[in-house]
Amino acid sequence: MAFFVHRFANRALRVTLALFSDFKIEGQENIPADGPLIVVANHQSNVDPAILATSIQRNARFLSKDTIFNNVTPAGRWFLRAYGAYPLRRGEMDLKALRWALTELKRPTATLVLFPEGTRNPGSMKSAHSGIVPLAARAGIPILPVGMEGVEGMRSVLRIFKPKGSIRVRIGRPFHLNVQGKLSRNDTEAAVSEIMGRIAVLLPESYRGDYKEAAEATFVFTSTNELSDD
């Protein structure tokens, strides 16, 4: 059931995006055809998960703040779960959500979408949470960076029925997190900055916010599979 809900919702969104907005996806050739994958992106609006899922065209799963599940009807909660969302308690180490994510990522075709900022930041990127690092390190799978521009105008989820404006989704090259063992706090923050820098470099400078310098820095904790990488 979840697969069909996800596929139907994404197809419907692609239709409305094509009809009512100037919607373009760049870098689709960077999306791995198979294998488990973590997707990381900047977070501008409530419709970001849907925009991202319809762009990468994989059966994505999401970690979503638990308050979203608490503020909707039972039918709304059913749809959220059917679409692939799982509640995450923010402000603490949610071990239940972490176990769920790691279990999901064992599936051969798993796609887990994360917004490291943890909350919407319309316009420019803000500081990300460090939880992405231990999760990605334990999973040991490719990470796909995505930069979304122009989505900040879609503040209401109802906007998916009539999106407007220019929306750009830019998909970067997959990369790996090169860490072993437990990192110090400083190294963890540096790894987070690199992950966010790989998102920021896909965005206009005005969107980069706290990660303007990270987008231009040398990458140490992350690398792609290409010899030409940093």
Language-model regions, residue ranges each:
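Short, basic, glycine/proline-bearing loop/turn elements
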Residues: 12-14, 82-88, 115-120
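Conserved beta-strand scaffold positions in the cores of enzyme catalytic domains, especially
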Residues: 25, 62, 85-87, 143-145, ...
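A short, well-structured juxtamembrane/interface segment
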Residues: 14-35, 176
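N-terminal membrane-anchoring alpha-helices
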Residues: 1-22, 218
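Non-catalytic C-terminal accessory region of glycerolipid acyltransferases
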Residues: 4-5, 96-230
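Catalytic core of membrane glycerolipid acyltransferases/transacylases, capturing the structured
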Residues: 3, 18, 32-92, 100
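A generic structural signal for well-ordered alpha-helical segments
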Residues: 16, 79-80, 105, 136
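A conditional alpha-helix N-cap/helix-loop micro-motif detector
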Residues: 21, 91-95, 125
